[in-house]
């Protein structure tokens, strides 16, 4: 019987362990990259879809174990296009969709229907089918090349006139600074003018208020005197004329006399001073 674990192994005379390691690594790389076009991956659905067999709703961003397949077609002969296939979680129907690098989107192929298809208002039939025609690609490439050439020419001209550009920028900055200073001066002047106008208006209002108060006082005094005159000059009010003053200096003028020294008695006998009755 042979040994289960062989201890003695045959090594040929031309055996080199370094070369054997290199060969094993190369074979491992070949085995890994042998079926690179077909690979099983873990993916998430990029949009919501519906299965055509069982009408199962598959939401967006749901995880699946699917397969990735590299197609022979290429967008603009440089960008690769991949086909992704998943199975329906209810009926195991295969659903396939592929990448669309022209519109930065995905296109449904087999087994399902996309629930919502975003469409632009000015899209053509080719754009709706997410396939760009050869003429359109050529026109777009020509436009892109023209734009690149124009940009390069503009950059060259700018490189030739760098000093002029710097001078223009400096002049522009200086002009902006001068404009800012002028604006600040105008703002200060406007503030001063507005403050002066406010002071003048306040003084005018104060003078007007003073004049109004003096006029009101004069009017009140005149009104009081007028009312008093009207009361005194009424026709039925003659009491002042009938009244006589208590003291009339004109009536007693020249009539004041001294008291006589002669005394009288009720019997009619005159009695003089210094004499007595016998």
UniProtKB/Swiss-Prot annotation:
Zn(2+) binds at residues 51, 54, 88, 91. A motif (Nuclear localization signal) lies at residues 242-258, 260-278. It comes from the Eukaryota. GO terms for molecular function: metal ion binding; U2 snRNA binding. Pfam families: Saf4_Yju2 (PF04502). GO terms for cellular component: nucleus; Prp19 complex; U2-type catalytic step 1 spliceosome; U2-type catalytic step 2 spliceosome. InterPro entries: Saf4/Yju2, Yju2. Induction: Expressed in exponential-phase cells grown in rich medium. Keywords: Metal-binding, mRNA processing, mRNA splicing, Nucleus, Spliceosome, Zinc. The keyword Cytoplasm does not apply. One of its GO terms (biological process) is RNA splicing. Residues 228-278 are annotated as: Disordered. It is found in: Nucleus. Coiled coil: none annotated. Component of the spliceosome. Present in the activated B complex, the catalytically activated B* complex which catalyzes the branching, the catalytic step 1 C complex catalyzing the exon ligation, and the postcatalytic P complex containing the ligated exons (mRNA) and the excised lariat intron. Interacts (via C-terminus) with CLF1. Interacts (via N-terminus) with SYF1. Interacts with U2 snRNA; this interaction is direct. Present with 2250 molecules/cell in log phase SD medium. Part of the spliceosome which catalyzes two sequential transesterification reactions, first the excision of the non-coding intron from pre-mRNA and then the ligation of the coding exons to form the mature mRNA. Plays a role (via N-terminus) in stabilizing the structure of the spliceosome catalytic core and docking of the branch helix into the active site, producing 5'-exon and lariat intron-3'-intermediates. Further stabilizes spliceosome conformation for 3'-splice site docking (via C-terminus) promoting exon ligation. Belongs to the CWC16 family. YJU2 subfamily. This is Splicing factor YJU2. It comes from Saccharomyces cerevisiae (strain ATCC 204508 / S288c) (Baker's yeast).
């Amino acid at each position: 019987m042979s040994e289960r674990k062989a201890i003695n192994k045959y090594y040929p005379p031309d055996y080199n362990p370094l070369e054997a390691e290199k060969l094993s690594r190369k074979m491992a790389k070949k085995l890994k990259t042998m079926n690179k076009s077909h690979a099983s991956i873990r993916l998430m659905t990029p949009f919501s879809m519906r299965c055509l067999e069982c009408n199962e709703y598959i939401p967006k961003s749901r995880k699946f174990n699917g397969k990735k397949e590299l197609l022979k077609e290429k967008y603009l002969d440089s960008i690769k296009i991949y086909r992704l296939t998943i199975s329906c979680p209810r009926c195991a129907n295969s659903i396939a969709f592929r990448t669309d690098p022209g519109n930065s989107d995905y296109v449904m192929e087999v087994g399902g229907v996309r629930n919502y298809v975003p469409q632009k208002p000015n899209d053509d039939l080719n754009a709706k089918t997410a396939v760009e025609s050869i003429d359109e690609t050529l026109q777009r490439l020509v436009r892109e090349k023209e734009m690149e050439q124009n940009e390069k020419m503009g950059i060259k001209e700018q490189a030739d006139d760098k000093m002029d550009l710097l001078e223009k920028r400096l002049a522009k900055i200086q002009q902006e600074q001068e404009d800012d200073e002028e604006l600040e001066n105008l703002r200060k002047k406007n503030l001063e003018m507005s403050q002066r106008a406010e002071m003048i208006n306040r003084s005018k209002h104060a003078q007007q208020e003073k004049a109004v108060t003096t006029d009101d006082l004069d009017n009140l005094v005149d009104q009081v005197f007028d009312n008093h005159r009207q009361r005194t000059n009424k026709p039925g009010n003659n009491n002042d004329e009938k009244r006589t003053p208590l003291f009339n200096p004109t009536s007693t003028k020249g009539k004041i006399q001294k008291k006589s020294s002669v005394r009288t008695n009720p019997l009619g006998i005159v009695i003089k001073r210094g004499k007595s009755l016998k």
